[in-house]
Amino acid sequence: MDQKIIQLSNNVQVANDKPFVLFGGMNVLESRDLAMSIAEHYVEVTQKLGIPYVFKASFDKANRSSVNSYRGPGMEEGLRIFEEIKSTFNVPMITDVHEIHQCAPVAEVVDIIQLPAFLARQTDLVVAMAKTGAVINVKKPQFLAPHEMRHIITKFNEAGNDNIILCERGSSFGYNNLVVDMLGMDEMKQTGYPVIFDATHALQRPGGRADSAGGRRAQATELARSGMALGLAGLFIEAHPDPDNAKCDGPCALPLHLLEKYLTQMKAVDELVKSFEFIDTSK
């Protein structure tokens, strides 16, 4: 099957048969200074390792477990920070939207707008995102089977947008738990669209800490290596210099100081797997 190539700025290409792209950053913008510092570290490490890179952060976490949880600085301030990061480091950027009115202004600043998993079946939001003409990253809902992603793809296509990336972030497995279906990611690859793996959110234990999500940070490397062995278009991760005190999803975040060691392993797995000849076992 032909593999679709998504072309971003800086000659970054996202495709299942290309070297993997890192979609990395922080969960939510906590401050301008912290965002700049984290972005700088990612840029230094990815340039050293020769890994194509897209910066990620959220300006609003609209689906927190508790009404009292930190959500972020909001769209206006968030876009100002994104513009500064983009102009300073000259990297493509991705962030998520939650409401129709956010789509157009966000698409003017970032390269990729992300459809959150919980909202992936909201047709009006899908259409508004599609009409921006931006590249779209679709988070697979925890409650959908991999083959059902074709319906979401069709919605974007019918609205005039074919620049789609699919992202696996785990599937619900009973209460307060997620599992990753490796064969499901391969099934999504059969669409021809690039598939990336959100290896940090897949470590979540939703609602695992009563009023916020828990996580399994200690298994971050094992899960990511397993996903990369499928030969994916990209890896999606979030890191923090002090995960235990991060304002959102700290239990899933990779400690920032481990980024280089972590990515060195992921690149090695990606290069090895993509050096293999494809074996068609269906015949």
Swiss-Prot record:
InterPro entries: Aldolase_TIM (IPR013785), DAHP1/KDSA (IPR006218), KDO8P_synthase (IPR006269). Its main location: cytoplasm. One of its GO terms (molecular function) is 3-deoxy-8-phosphooctulonate synthase activity. It is found in: Cytoplasm. It is an enzyme of class 2 (transferase). It catalyses: D-arabinose 5-phosphate + phosphoenolpyruvate + H2O = 3-deoxy-alpha-D-manno-2-octulosonate-8-phosphate + phosphate. It comes from the Bacteria. GO terms for cellular component: cytoplasm. Its EC number is 2.5.1.55. Keywords: Cytoplasm, Lipopolysaccharide biosynthesis, Transferase. One of its GO terms (biological process) is keto-3-deoxy-D-manno-octulosonic acid biosynthetic process. Pathway: Carbohydrate biosynthesis; 3-deoxy-D-manno-octulosonate biosynthesis; 3-deoxy-D-manno-octulosonate from D-ribulose 5-phosphate: step 2/3; Bacterial outer membrane biogenesis; lipopolysaccharide biosynthesis. Gene3D superfamilies: Aldolase class I (3.20.20.70). Belongs to the KdsA family. PANTHER family: PHOSPHO-2-DEHYDRO-3-DEOXYHEPTONATE ALDOLASE. This is 2-dehydro-3-deoxyphosphooctonate aldolase. It comes from Shewanella frigidimarina (strain NCIMB 400). The gene is kdsA.
